[in-house]
Regions:
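Hydrophobic/small/kink-forming positions within alpha-helical transmembrane segments
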Residues: 97, 101, 201, 205-206
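Hydrophobic core of transmembrane alpha-helices in multi-pass small-molecule transporters
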Residues: 46, 139-165
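Perimembrane loop-to-helix junctions flanking transmembrane segments
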Residues: 65-83
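Symmetry-related core transmembrane helices of the 12-TM Major Facilitator Superfamily/SLC fold
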Residues: 224-236
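Cytoplasmic membrane-interface "Motif A"-like loop-to-helix N-cap segments
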Residues: 108-121, 220-221
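Helix-to-loop junctions at the C-terminal end of transmembrane segments
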Residues: 101-111, 215
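Short, Lys/Arg-rich, polar N-terminal cytosolic tail immediately upstream
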Residues: 3, 9-35
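C-terminal ends and interior cores of transmembrane alpha-helices
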Residues: 124-137
Length: 249
Protein backbone atom coordinates (compact mmCIF):
# COMPACT_ATOMS: atom_id res chain seq x y z
CA UNK A 1 0.00 0.00 0.00
CA UNK A 2 2.83 2.41 0.88
CA UNK A 3 4.51 1.61 -2.43
CA UNK A 4 1.25 2.39 -4.24
CA UNK A 5 0.91 5.73 -2.40
CA UNK A 6 4.49 6.62 -3.34
CA UNK A 7 3.82 6.04 -7.04
CA UNK A 8 0.60 8.06 -6.86
CA UNK A 9 2.42 11.00 -5.27
CA UNK A 10 5.22 10.76 -7.83
CA UNK A 11 2.66 10.74 -10.65
CA UNK A 12 0.90 13.80 -9.19
CA UNK A 13 4.20 15.70 -8.95
CA UNK A 14 5.08 14.85 -12.55
CA UNK A 15 1.63 15.97 -13.72
CA UNK A 16 2.01 19.27 -11.86
CA UNK A 17 5.39 19.79 -13.52
CA UNK A 18 3.91 19.16 -16.96
CA UNK A 19 0.94 21.45 -16.18
CA UNK A 20 3.22 24.34 -15.23
CA UNK A 21 5.43 23.74 -18.25
CA UNK A 22 8.52 22.86 -16.24
CA UNK A 23 9.18 19.33 -17.45
CA UNK A 24 11.99 20.22 -19.82
CA UNK A 25 13.63 22.34 -17.14
CA UNK A 26 13.43 19.87 -14.26
CA UNK A 27 17.15 19.79 -13.55
CA UNK A 28 18.74 21.75 -10.73
CA UNK A 29 21.11 23.69 -13.00
CA UNK A 30 18.53 24.64 -15.64
CA UNK A 31 15.91 25.47 -13.04
CA UNK A 32 18.30 27.79 -11.18
CA UNK A 33 19.30 29.46 -14.44
CA UNK A 34 15.63 30.07 -15.27
CA UNK A 35 14.90 31.41 -11.80
CA UNK A 36 17.84 33.80 -11.97
CA UNK A 37 16.67 35.14 -15.33
CA UNK A 38 13.15 35.67 -14.02
CA UNK A 39 14.46 37.48 -10.93
CA UNK A 40 16.62 39.74 -13.12
CA UNK A 41 13.69 40.49 -15.44
CA UNK A 42 11.45 41.32 -12.47
CA UNK A 43 14.09 43.67 -11.10
CA UNK A 44 14.40 45.45 -14.46
CA UNK A 45 10.61 45.75 -14.72
CA UNK A 46 10.45 47.29 -11.26
CA UNK A 47 13.32 49.61 -12.18
CA UNK A 48 11.56 50.92 -15.29
CA UNK A 49 8.37 51.58 -13.32
CA UNK A 50 10.39 53.30 -10.60
CA UNK A 51 12.28 55.55 -13.03
CA UNK A 52 9.12 56.43 -14.95
CA UNK A 53 7.64 57.93 -11.78
CA UNK A 54 10.81 59.95 -11.20
CA UNK A 55 10.18 61.55 -14.58
CA UNK A 56 6.53 62.26 -13.79
CA UNK A 57 7.48 64.06 -10.59
CA UNK A 58 10.74 65.61 -11.75
CA UNK A 59 10.00 67.08 -15.19
CA UNK A 60 6.32 67.81 -15.27
CA UNK A 61 4.42 64.63 -16.04
CA UNK A 62 6.75 63.35 -18.74
CA UNK A 63 7.40 59.63 -19.11
CA UNK A 64 10.93 58.27 -19.25
CA UNK A 65 10.09 54.82 -20.65
CA UNK A 66 6.47 55.10 -21.86
CA UNK A 67 6.96 56.48 -25.36
CA UNK A 68 3.34 55.94 -26.42
CA UNK A 69 2.26 58.54 -23.87
CA UNK A 70 5.04 60.92 -24.89
CA UNK A 71 4.19 60.53 -28.58
CA UNK A 72 0.52 61.28 -27.88
CA UNK A 73 1.40 64.41 -25.91
CA UNK A 74 3.84 65.49 -28.62
CA UNK A 75 1.07 65.25 -31.21
CA UNK A 76 -1.37 67.09 -28.91
CA UNK A 77 0.93 70.07 -28.36
CA UNK A 78 1.82 70.21 -32.05
CA UNK A 79 -1.88 70.28 -32.93
CA UNK A 80 -2.39 73.10 -30.41
CA UNK A 81 0.51 75.03 -31.92
CA UNK A 82 2.45 74.84 -28.63
CA UNK A 83 5.78 74.03 -30.23
CA UNK A 84 7.89 74.92 -27.20
CA UNK A 85 5.83 72.58 -25.02
CA UNK A 86 6.16 69.84 -27.65
CA UNK A 87 9.95 70.12 -27.87
CA UNK A 88 10.83 68.32 -24.58
CA UNK A 89 8.72 65.32 -25.65
CA UNK A 90 10.59 65.22 -28.94
CA UNK A 91 13.89 65.18 -27.03
CA UNK A 92 12.68 62.33 -24.82
CA UNK A 93 11.54 60.25 -27.79
CA UNK A 94 14.82 60.88 -29.62
CA UNK A 95 16.74 59.89 -26.48
CA UNK A 96 14.80 56.63 -26.20
CA UNK A 97 15.53 55.82 -29.86
CA UNK A 98 19.19 56.63 -29.32
CA UNK A 99 19.19 54.29 -26.31
CA UNK A 100 17.91 51.45 -28.50
CA UNK A 101 20.58 52.28 -31.08
CA UNK A 102 23.28 52.33 -28.40
CA UNK A 103 22.05 49.05 -26.96
CA UNK A 104 22.29 47.32 -30.32
CA UNK A 105 25.83 48.66 -30.78
CA UNK A 106 26.80 47.35 -27.33
CA UNK A 107 25.27 43.94 -28.12
CA UNK A 108 27.23 43.73 -31.37
CA UNK A 109 30.44 44.76 -29.63
CA UNK A 110 30.07 42.32 -26.71
CA UNK A 111 28.06 39.36 -28.06
CA UNK A 112 29.27 37.00 -25.33
CA UNK A 113 28.46 39.29 -22.40
CA UNK A 114 25.27 41.04 -23.46
CA UNK A 115 23.55 41.27 -20.06
CA UNK A 116 26.66 42.48 -18.30
CA UNK A 117 27.54 45.01 -21.01
CA UNK A 118 24.01 46.43 -21.23
CA UNK A 119 23.62 46.70 -17.45
CA UNK A 120 27.02 48.34 -17.07
CA UNK A 121 26.17 50.92 -19.73
CA UNK A 122 22.75 51.50 -18.17
CA UNK A 123 24.38 52.05 -14.78
CA UNK A 124 26.78 54.57 -16.30
CA UNK A 125 23.89 56.50 -17.88
CA UNK A 126 22.02 56.63 -14.57
CA UNK A 127 25.23 57.85 -12.94
CA UNK A 128 25.41 60.68 -15.50
CA UNK A 129 21.87 61.72 -14.58
CA UNK A 130 22.80 61.47 -10.89
CA UNK A 131 25.78 63.79 -11.42
CA UNK A 132 23.75 66.29 -13.47
CA UNK A 133 21.25 66.61 -10.64
CA UNK A 134 24.14 66.84 -8.16
CA UNK A 135 25.51 69.75 -10.20
CA UNK A 136 22.08 71.39 -9.94
CA UNK A 137 21.06 70.75 -13.56
CA UNK A 138 17.45 69.96 -12.70
CA UNK A 139 15.54 70.62 -15.90
CA UNK A 140 14.69 68.13 -18.65
CA UNK A 141 18.35 67.68 -19.62
CA UNK A 142 19.20 65.86 -16.40
CA UNK A 143 16.60 63.19 -17.16
CA UNK A 144 17.58 62.48 -20.77
CA UNK A 145 20.28 59.94 -19.72
CA UNK A 146 17.56 58.02 -17.86
CA UNK A 147 15.46 57.86 -21.02
CA UNK A 148 18.49 56.66 -22.98
CA UNK A 149 18.95 53.99 -20.29
CA UNK A 150 15.35 52.82 -20.70
CA UNK A 151 15.75 52.56 -24.48
CA UNK A 152 18.97 50.66 -23.90
CA UNK A 153 17.29 48.25 -21.48
CA UNK A 154 14.82 47.16 -24.13
CA UNK A 155 17.63 45.69 -26.22
CA UNK A 156 18.28 43.03 -23.59
CA UNK A 157 16.84 39.67 -24.57
CA UNK A 158 16.23 37.78 -21.33
CA UNK A 159 14.61 34.67 -22.76
CA UNK A 160 12.53 32.42 -20.52
CA UNK A 161 10.73 29.62 -22.37
CA UNK A 162 9.30 31.35 -25.46
CA UNK A 163 9.20 34.82 -23.88
CA UNK A 164 11.59 37.76 -23.97
CA UNK A 165 11.13 39.53 -20.64
CA UNK A 166 12.66 42.45 -18.75
CA UNK A 167 11.65 45.18 -21.20
CA UNK A 168 9.66 48.34 -20.51
CA UNK A 169 6.79 47.63 -22.94
CA UNK A 170 4.06 46.97 -20.40
CA UNK A 171 1.30 47.30 -22.96
CA UNK A 172 2.99 44.32 -24.61
CA UNK A 173 3.07 42.47 -21.29
CA UNK A 174 -0.68 42.98 -20.80
CA UNK A 175 -1.33 41.89 -24.40
CA UNK A 176 0.80 38.81 -23.81
CA UNK A 177 -1.16 38.13 -20.60
CA UNK A 178 -4.45 38.09 -22.49
CA UNK A 179 -3.22 35.85 -25.30
CA UNK A 180 -1.42 33.49 -22.89
CA UNK A 181 -4.60 33.06 -20.83
CA UNK A 182 -6.41 32.13 -24.03
CA UNK A 183 -3.64 29.71 -25.03
CA UNK A 184 -3.58 28.16 -21.56
CA UNK A 185 -7.36 27.64 -21.59
CA UNK A 186 -6.97 25.93 -24.97
CA UNK A 187 -4.16 23.81 -23.46
CA UNK A 188 -1.67 25.11 -26.00
CA UNK A 189 0.49 26.71 -23.28
CA UNK A 190 1.13 26.01 -19.60
CA UNK A 191 -0.52 28.26 -17.01
CA UNK A 192 2.95 29.35 -15.94
CA UNK A 193 3.09 31.62 -19.03
CA UNK A 194 0.23 34.01 -18.08
CA UNK A 195 1.27 33.86 -14.43
CA UNK A 196 4.72 35.15 -15.42
CA UNK A 197 3.13 37.98 -17.45
CA UNK A 198 0.96 38.94 -14.49
CA UNK A 199 3.91 38.85 -12.11
CA UNK A 200 6.00 41.12 -14.37
CA UNK A 201 3.16 43.66 -14.59
CA UNK A 202 2.51 43.61 -10.83
CA UNK A 203 6.22 44.12 -10.09
CA UNK A 204 6.43 47.04 -12.55
CA UNK A 205 3.41 48.71 -10.96
CA UNK A 206 4.92 48.05 -7.53
CA UNK A 207 8.15 49.78 -8.59
CA UNK A 208 6.17 52.81 -9.75
CA UNK A 209 4.10 52.74 -6.55
CA UNK A 210 7.24 52.67 -4.42
CA UNK A 211 8.72 55.64 -6.27
CA UNK A 212 5.44 57.51 -5.90
CA UNK A 213 5.57 57.05 -2.12
CA UNK A 214 9.26 57.91 -1.74
CA UNK A 215 9.59 60.77 -4.24
CA UNK A 216 7.74 63.49 -2.26
CA UNK A 217 9.91 62.91 0.82
CA UNK A 218 13.29 61.84 -0.60
CA UNK A 219 15.30 63.85 -3.16
CA UNK A 220 15.60 62.37 -6.65
CA UNK A 221 19.38 62.40 -6.33
CA UNK A 222 19.18 60.14 -3.26
CA UNK A 223 16.78 57.75 -4.99
CA UNK A 224 19.06 57.52 -8.03
CA UNK A 225 21.99 56.87 -5.70
CA UNK A 226 20.12 53.91 -4.21
CA UNK A 227 19.33 52.64 -7.73
CA UNK A 228 23.02 52.86 -8.62
CA UNK A 229 24.03 50.86 -5.55
CA UNK A 230 21.48 48.15 -6.35
CA UNK A 231 22.57 48.02 -10.01
CA UNK A 232 26.21 47.63 -9.00
CA UNK A 233 25.23 44.74 -6.73
CA UNK A 234 23.27 43.14 -9.59
CA UNK A 235 26.31 43.46 -11.87
CA UNK A 236 28.50 41.75 -9.26
CA UNK A 237 25.93 38.95 -8.91
CA UNK A 238 25.80 38.46 -12.70
CA UNK A 239 29.60 38.22 -12.83
CA UNK A 240 29.47 35.53 -10.14
CA UNK A 241 26.66 33.67 -11.93
CA UNK A 242 28.57 33.75 -15.22
CA UNK A 243 31.33 31.76 -13.57
CA UNK A 244 28.90 29.09 -12.35
CA UNK A 245 26.43 29.21 -15.26
CA UNK A 246 28.19 30.09 -18.54
CA UNK A 247 24.86 30.30 -20.39
CA UNK A 248 23.55 33.02 -18.06
CA UNK A 249 24.38 35.93 -20.38
Amino acid sequence: MKRYDFHVKQFMIEEAIVFLGLKERFTIENRMNRQHKIILALFLSALSGFIDILGLFGIGKMFLSFMSGNSTRLAFYLAEGEFLLALPYLFLIASFVFGAFLGDVVKSRFPGEVLLAILTTETFLIFISFMMIFLDIKDEWSYLPLTIAMGLQNTMHIRVDDKIIGRTFFSGVLHSLGTDISQAMQKNKPWGAPLLDLLIWVVAVSGAFLAGILQPNIPTQTLLGLVLIILLLVIVIIIMLNKKQPDFR
